[in-house]
Curated annotation (Swiss-Prot):
One of its GO terms (cellular component) is cytosol. The keyword Repeat applies. This is tRNA (guanine-N(7)-)-methyltransferase non-catalytic subunit. It comes from Caenorhabditis elegans. HAMAP family: TRM82 (MF_03056).
Length: 388
């Protein structure tokens, strides 16, 4: 798994167990963000839910998702969160000097999740990290102490999570062709379902509080009204590229969306300034596949199998960012955790769905029974008086 994200001029890349960073204005080689040896065992929050008592042992740590905080805190802190195949969520903070150089980075907290994480995002205030997992559950973790609560559950694997800019809606995309908008933090209230995709929904991009873009396996780009939740307002068919859509990223400053596809090197940039969506295709020089894409200021940052490119939205020119040999090897050799998200339609999917649903409800009932037992076992009545 390999990812790229950005905050202002700073870009972060995660691949395998590596985390690298660079500033766009410097155009220098990437630097190591933090060493895993800095993980403080005392800051690993023990899980409150019923999973393995010990942390999952893996042959090699692999990062499965990556996110950067939304705003600067009052002390100028920036936060980065990653989820790994150890079923852990690690939160780091870093500080910069007046020149924008990172002067220190340290481990804040680690939380343990029930299942392997698939998507991660900070809430509006950066007080919590929200994580979706393979089992269809969404948990929220405090960045201060790692405490966790379950926010939502589904039958299908969560593939992406996002927030509306006002922080009042949590948006979830899943493998069962749908997107949900949940009220936040009262996520027991589902405001709306967005139905129209015919294959899995892999990726979301939020334009404003009432404009959501989604895409995935059906090769279509959909635009939805979050408030009205009706049919898509705009649709763009990208099936001519003959590949599922891997990721979309929106640049609000230039009002453009970038689209990358599975296993091809083309980036499609969609101009949102006109009602009729206009597209421009950009082939990434010297690359065979685009793994991830992020937006920052005047650029789309594209992560490939062996390269990092910046697409300047003022002139559509590309800038090449040098990367080190270790990262190149990792980008080349690291594969997706799940290679194929399409459903197997060669057998009775209904039977499989009913089994997953029954298992999910059984887990919920177990949690309720355990909670009732805890309450009944702590009724405030101690042992009777002693006769001695």
């Amino acid at each position: 798994m390999s990812f790229i994200t950005a905050f202002r001029e700073r870009v972060f890349i995660a691949s395998g167990d590596l985390i690298r960073t660079f500033r766009i204005s410097e155009e220098t080689e990437l630097k190591n963000f933090i060493s895993w040896s800095k993980i403080n065992p005392e800051r690993i929050q023990k899980p409150s839910f019923d999973i393995e008592k010990e942390l999952k042992a893996v042959e090699k740590r692999v990062i499965l998702c990556l996110a950067h905080s939304n705003v600067l805190t009052t002390h100028g802190r920036r936060l980065v969160a990653v989820g790994t195949n150890e079923k852990q969520i690690h939160v780091f903070e870093y500080f910069v000097n007046d020149k924008g150089d990172i002067v220190t980075a340290e481990h804040i907290v680690t939380s343990v999740v029930p299942k392997a994480p698939t998507a991660i995002v900070f809430d509006k205030e950066d007080a919590y990290v929200v994580v979706g997992d393979r089992a269809g559950d969404v948990h929220r973790f405090s960045v201060l102490n790692g405490s966790a609560i379950e926010m939502a559950g589904a039958i299908s694997m969560i593939l992406d999570v996002a927030f509306s800019p006002d922080g009042k809606r949590l948006l979830m995309a899943d493998r069962d062709e749908k997107v949900r908008a949940l009220r936040y933090p009262a996520t027991s209230v589902i405001d709306s379902f967005f139905l129209g995709h015919t294959e899995y929904v892999k990726t979301l991009a939020v334009q404003d509080n009432d404009s959501l873009w989604s895409s995935g396996g059906d090769k279509n780009l959909y635009n939805w009204s979050i408030a009205k939740c009706s049919a898509p307002r705009r649709t763009l068919d990208l099936s001519q590229f003959d590949a599922p859509i891997r990721k979309i990223s929106i640049n609000l400053q230039h009002k453009k969306i970038a689209v990358i596809f599975e296993k091809i090197e083309t980036v499609v940039i969609v101009d949102l300034n006109q009602e009729s969506l206009q597209t421009t295709s950009v082939s990434i020089v010297g690359e065979s596949q685009c793994l991830d894409i992020a937006s920052t200021k005047d650029y789309f940052a594209v992560l490939g199998r062996s390269t990092v490119h910046l697409i300047d939205l003022n002139n559509m020119e590309q800038k090449f960012v040098p990367i080190d040999e270790e990262l190149t090897i990792t980008l080349t050799s690291t594969n997706d955790a799940i290679d194929n998200l399409f459903k197997n339609v060669t057998h009775n999917n209904q039977q499989e769905y009913e089994k997953r649903k029954a298992d999910k409800f059984e887990q919920i009932e177990k949690k309720k029974r355990r909670l009732n037992e805890d309450i009944n076992g702590d009724d405030g009545e101690g042992p009777g008086p002693s006769n001695s």
